[in-house]
Amino acid sequence: GLSEDYVKPTIGPDGAITYGFFAMSEDGSDLPDSLGGYELDWTLCEPVGRGNFVFAEKEYRGIPTLQSRYMSADTPEEEAQLERFASCGGEYADVPLLIFDVRSNPGGSDWWFMEWFNGWTGQYAQPHKCTGHRYSQIGCDFLDYPDEAMGTWQVSSRPGRWVEREGLTFLLTDAATASAGEDVLLDLHTVENTLVVGVNTGGCSLVPDNFTCYLPNTGLPIFFGTGLGFYETMENRDTVGYAPDLWVNPPDALDAVARMCEYYGLRG
């Protein structure tokens, strides 16, 4: 048989679930030219790019589609988009089909999605996780922790909570989905009838609570985290990311999901 390292479930041209050749590689030079009698011509999967918005709502071929490209705002217009994001979850609570698109979302604050999820399901997401946070001088300054806590650790663990839901949810990801963008994936992994479509995420979830600080003598900015976080299988997924359920070149993922819904009669 063919190795699972290269053969993955995907969505075919007609919308049927089938198999295709996908692999993780830095530049493709380490990939085989043939497998099991198949001659292979590898193509690089590309991210879709952020675009000129942080959150948008639309319908794609009759399917409600939410696009989250960044969870931070630089302008009043973007702030309004994020406020809409946080407040609209309840409007999608009963839709039978939903596409949630976090392709090329590099992160920001996960608060916006947490509030959306609460409106959507009636509860906050609780993925299986274990986190540790060291109370450093910088952390105490930034987060107003008491000085007497400095040098100690706060460690917490929770088993996770499953959310039952009858409607189908499709999450779109690409290699530029990272940090808070990956939190969306981890949270939606707790929801019944959710499928992730695309490719591996960027792998940027080990170190939470990142801040920009400035060196005292040069004024140079540095950006780093103040804790450690492990999720689901408790493996470090940095640089590897989280794999999709169905592998599709990210620019084609939206159309592929619509084809699949049509092929299997999921629109009702």
Where are these regions (language model features)?
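Solvent-exposed loop/turn segments at secondary-structure junctions
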Residues: 70-74, 104-110, 175-179, 201-205, ...
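Gly/Ser/Thr-rich loop/hinge elements
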Residues: 106-168, 207-214, 226-230, 236-238
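Extended C-terminal subregions enriched in glycine
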Residues: 168-190, 195-203
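BRCT (BRCA1 C-terminal) domain core and associated BRCT-interaction motifs
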Residues: 196-254
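Flexible, low-complexity junctional segments that flank or bridge functional domains
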Residues: 1-98, 102-128, 168, 211-216, ...
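Short, flexible loop segments at the rims of nucleotide/cofactor-binding pockets, characterized by
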Residues: 73-79, 146-149, 173-174
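Amphipathic coiled-coil/heptad-repeat helices and related helical stalk/stem segments
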Residues: 81-85, 155-156, 180-181
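Extracytoplasmic/peripheral linker and loop segments enriched in polar/acidic and small residues
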Residues: 158-162, 239-268
